[in-house]
Amino acid sequence: MDTVLNNINQSRYFNDSTANTKIEEIKKHLDSPSDADKLESMKKLIAMLSKGRDVSEAFPQVVKNVIVKNLEIKKLVYMYLVHYAESQNDSALLSINTIQKSLNDQSQVIRASALRVMSSIRVIDIIEVIILAIEKSVKDTSPFVRKAAAFAIAKVHKLDCDKQEPLIDLLEILLNDTSTMVLGAAIVAFNELCPQRFDLLHQHYRKICQLLADFDEWSQVIVLDILTKYARSQFRCPDSTMNDKNIKQFKKKSKSFYSDEEDQEDDEPENSLYKKKPLERDMFDSSEEIDMDHRLLLKSTLPLLQSRNNAVVMAVSSLYFYCAPSIEAQKVGKSLVRILRSGPEVQYITLTNISTMVTLRPSMFEPHLSEFFIHSSDPEYSIKLKLEILTRLATPENIGKILKEFKEYVKNEDKKFVAATIQAIGSCASTVPDVTESCIYGLMSLLSNQSTVVVAESVIVLKRLLQLNATNEKLEKLEKEKEKEKDVKENQSTISKHSSSNNSIKYDNIILHLSKLLDTLQVPSARASIVWVIGEYCYRVPLVAPDVFRKLVKSFSDEHESVKLETLNLGSKLYVQFTDNNSTTTTDNSIPNEFKNERTKEKITLMFQYVLNLAKFDQNYDIRDNSRMLKHFYFNTENTQSINSNIKQIVINQKPIPTETSISEDRQRFTLGSLSHIVNHTALGYTALPDFPDVAPDPSVREPIQRWIPNQQSQQQQHQQQQLNNIFVDTPFYSDEEEEDEEEYDEEEEEEEYEEQNEYEDFFGEEKKNKKKNRKQQNYDEDEYNQDIDDGEYDGEGEVQAEDEDDFDELFGITNDDNNQTANGIGGGGSGEEEMDKFDFENYINSTTKSVKKILLKPTISGGLSIDYCFIRIRDNEEFSCQPRYNIIQLNIKNQSDETFTDISIINKNLIDGADISEFDPIESIEPNQAIQKQIYVLFNSTSQSCKFEISFNKGNFPVTLTPIIGELLIPIVPIYESISQWKDEFEEVGEFKQVDDQFEFGDQCLDKLNNNNNNNNNNNNESGDENIGLMPILPIVLEGINLIPIASNKLKSKIQFASKTLLKDENIYVQIQLLKQQPPTVNCIIRSNDQVVSALLLKKLKDVLQK
């Protein structure tokens, strides 16, 4: 009851009064300190947004509320940001810093929502930042966040397909997850990212099958579709006849509709197998030889037929239809019939799929025939599909039941429904020849109906049935003659009996009845059908056909085009019958006496010539062409003998058996359940099912990787020992330490919220409030503290104090007069502020003027020409040899072959907007083993998009790619001041900076440098210079990887600060590296800049350099 009242209360936000609320009033409430006012305003905004109103005006106020603690407000803010992320890219980017910080929030809901918002911002410039966030989220402890990371991978791939390879690496991590929530989302991302990479699924196939029932229902739909394609490509066809349309499948015993035995095999008597055809026995036995993994798939998906989600039931049905043996595919029929009772949309989709299934395997739905009977409430589309299904299910055993139902349908007042039923009757008569005669006479009774629509449809169907019956008579006579030659008396009697039943149809009475309808029936298609029937069987009614032709000639000019064409054909056939006295009719060997009447022959000839002359001037070109052709056949003076000898074979020939075309048969080319199958044409993104392989691939690829499992006995012993230890340790339920941690966390959250609030107020032009922010102090355990004291790295009196982390004090190590805290970590200077000294950078900047060399063109690809390159670094005060923002790249071109290469140049540049390459002058020739250096100037205009071009020479053109390196998109700022305090004043003029930071351990390369340095210091009795203390041993590694310049450091060189600026946007960047612990060596990296994209990329680059 409370939920209902709450929903009613929430609906008030969508009424007209709320939707017309002024934006200014909402903006005022969003700036209110009350969470209740903010929540009310956000609900109004979302309601207005959902009704199509533009509320982007409130964006600045909404963004500021990202930092609030209230979870419901944050959810609404994120919903707002997702909506405007794509249409207002610049505005959405304003919140990227806060969203990044939310990725570290304690709440899993906030972390997942932040990632969802970030991945929804479709700006390619921040794609690297999004990928970094995904890399962090895939390793999150919460499955809810990892699930959001999986969906974010799919979004990033849609934004930039070039990032597929790194995204696949992240996807592999998620596929190894054991949480069904994450695994289902990962497979959905797999379907968007690389649906053909089945090699990624081999190791996880059995796990997916076993956990399939635990996935969420919408993930199950995607997973079932992928497993269907996987089974079709990895397993052999379980039934060699499953694609044969003309073979009836084995029929299972009919059970009650709501049966609990749906997932069990029916027990049949042992003597039931002898009743089956040999083909059906093979089909039944083939299921026993199915692959074990194939059997696991079928067994795991069968329970999903009872899912409440209709899409899941449809996906399982599609899987069984395409991948299961024919005998087992019949199990899905009952479930599909069950979901027919859902809404009209579901009913249409289900009936469309059933109509396609029935064309191939009618036995799947024969036990449920009555479920397809039409109800008075069925819509028109449902009626047509049900009638088609009923005709496909018609057999000699149930045709009586179906025709009895059709008899009631033709009495309906809806004439379109009756016309569709008449078509279904004709289809049943074609499928079951035994009822053709009764159907024909039943349709004859409908010719007296008052509705022209019913009469016209009856005539059209009668035409088809008469043609079909006449064709069957000819085939039976030919078969009878063959049997006579073989003297098989039993077969002769059977055929004669069947022929006599068919010959009982009185064509003359039917044609006579149809001819009378021409005087009243005005439907063109029906009139054309009657004329065709009279012309086709004119030898049966030699007196009626000429009179009908006479009436049609009189009204020829007023007839429809289709009737005119059939009139010409009728005249042609009558002329041939009356003029060819030596010929025989189609079915009789004797010529009727009426065709020998000369007077009638003369009248037919005159009427035929008259109608040919009328058709000669008709507006329709088909009628004109037909009249000229017939006139050339019958009244041509040249070569008359050669034409007359074949005229009868042309005009009066044996017609093929009429075939019915159905849209369901045309839909067979598309996969069941797909959008293309419904609309009957290839929709965007459709991929067809692969064919079964002739030889199954190696099944060993699906063997899971063996993991180390500890000894069970040792595990039990450890568990028992742990229980004994817990008995003697008296630990309170909530320890004091945990309570202190919670209090500290709450204080930190309040301080960060206040800090970010001030930041947004400054950003949007509000009054700046000069208040310092205090952060959580960094505490280290007692062992690490004692270790640091023993190593002689603390100068204090036994008390380690935390560092004041004000924006600039944290960067430069300078504190205010009222703060007595010292920097924490190696190099802390006791009580008082930590002094920073100017760094002597000249010895380092000169040694890193070039970056590490990289390969641009391999000689194995180009036939002997190798090209590697490196970035030429410049300082801020150096003059550019080209335009600003360009990188200088030095190419080392070498001929490693035995022949001379000529005309080496750069062609076919493929660059993004704003990018440019100033190529070198063409090289006329380069001798074997000769090396040449060239410089090019490149403007990348992006931190992630590559520059693509081709190297051309006499061997051909070879595509190459220059990728921007974030460490080379910087220019060091050369200090020109004498003291650090002057630098601080200079930096303060720029404004407040945004910051990204991370703590991590050193990699092997840096550890080796530090260890070697410590060993050397011990051997030299600690008398080495400054270059061997603190972070100095790894400084060359940092400068080699990133184009920075060191500005200042503390005395122990455990904290070093760098400065640089971006090449593209000319934004200052400040970097600090601080050594925190020695065991294990841990470093803290801080990067501050207004360019958040570069900051995030630079932090990742710095982390990669230090963790090598």
From Swiss-Prot:
It holds the Pfam family Adaptin_N. Residues 736-764, 780-797 have a biased composition (Acidic residues). SUPFAM superfamilies: ARM repeat. Residues 480-501, 736-797, 811-835 are annotated as: Disordered. It is found in: Endosome membrane. It comes from the Eukaryota. InterPro entries: AP3_beta, AP3B_C, AP_beta, ARM-like, ARM-type_fold, Clathrin/coatomer_adapt-like_N. GO terms for biological process: intracellular protein transport; vesicle-mediated transport. Keywords: Endosome, Membrane, Protein transport, Repeat, Transport. One of its GO terms (cellular component) is AP-3 adaptor complex. Transmembrane segments: none annotated. HEAT repeats lie at residues 90-127, 327-363, 397-433, 434-471. Residues 480-490 have a biased composition (Basic and acidic residues). Part of the AP-3 complex, an adaptor-related complex which is essential for the compartmentalization of the endocytic pathway. Belongs to the adaptor complexes large subunit family. Adaptor protein complex 3 (AP-3) is a heterotetramer composed of two large adaptins (delta-type subunit and beta-type subunit), a medium adaptin (mu-type subunit) and a small adaptin (sigma-type subunit). This is AP-3 complex subunit beta. It comes from Dictyostelium discoideum (Social amoeba). The gene is ap3b-1.
